[in-house]
Amino acid sequence: MARYCGPKNRVARRFGANIFGRSRNPLLKKPHPPGQHGMQRKKKSDYGLQLEEKQKLKACYGMIMEKQLVKAFKEVIHKQGNVAQMFLERFECRLDNMVYRMGFAKTIFAAQQLVAHGHILVNGRRVDRRSFFLRPGMQISLKEKSKRLQSVKDALESKDESSLPSYISLDKTGFKGELLVSPEQDQIEAQLPLPINISVVCEFLSHRT
């Protein structure tokens, strides 16, 4: 699966937030946007604003690819209900993101690596597809060997269980967690490192699908 391999600190500086949860906040050293004249920004057009919101969403979920974004939108656009919520749920309930939310990894990129390298089980079966969509009642756990990974132990030890969203549960000693219910839009937005106008993103994609 394709993945973003560019400078992640530059992306964080662009949006003015430590969106990837790195221990070394890139904004402490360079708080201004990237570029020679980073502080000088022209007023954005409506298209520019829509594009920026889309880029923020992609960044918040680990620099997901454009075709994954479009595919997720196509999956929900004709369904009954709140399209914006269903669209956002497609990313919040991705396996890599749930591994990150539950605290098995300190960053979304570390979570992606755990999944891709086959360390993660879903309902007892190995799943190495990062975009795998979890449904309520599905349980995430680690392979027996993977429980000995120091990076996982450190991540779980530093995870504050009081910060867990109400739609997931975590059993640190058992190295497992569960998606309890489908998250609501406001619950998901509360977990994002920066505000995103999801309706604007949906409007942007509706003209391109």
UniProtKB/Swiss-Prot annotation:
Signal peptide: none
SMART domains per record: Ribosomal_S4, S4
S4 RNA-binding domain ranges (all copies): 93-153
Domain of life, per lineage: Bacteria
Entry's Gene Ontology molecular function annotations: rRNA binding; structural constituent of ribosome
Entry annotated with the keyword Magnesium: no
Location of region: Disordered: 23-46
GO cellular component labels: small ribosomal subunit
KW rRNA-binding (keyword) present: yes
One of the GO BP terms on file: ribosomal small subunit biogenesis
Keywords: Ribonucleoprotein, Ribosomal protein, RNA-binding, rRNA-binding
Quaternary assembly: Part of the 30S ribosomal subunit. Contacts protein S5. The interaction surface between S4 and S5 is involved in control of translational fidelity.
HAMAP family: Ribosomal_uS4_B
Record NCBIfam families: PRK05327.1, rpsD_bact
UniProt similarity note: Belongs to the universal ribosomal protein uS4 family.
Purpose of the protein: One of the primary rRNA binding proteins, it binds directly to 16S rRNA where it nucleates assembly of the body of the 30S subunit.
Name this polypeptide is given: Small ribosomal subunit protein uS4
Organism field: Chlamydia pneumoniae (Chlamydophila pneumoniae)
Gene name of the record: rpsD
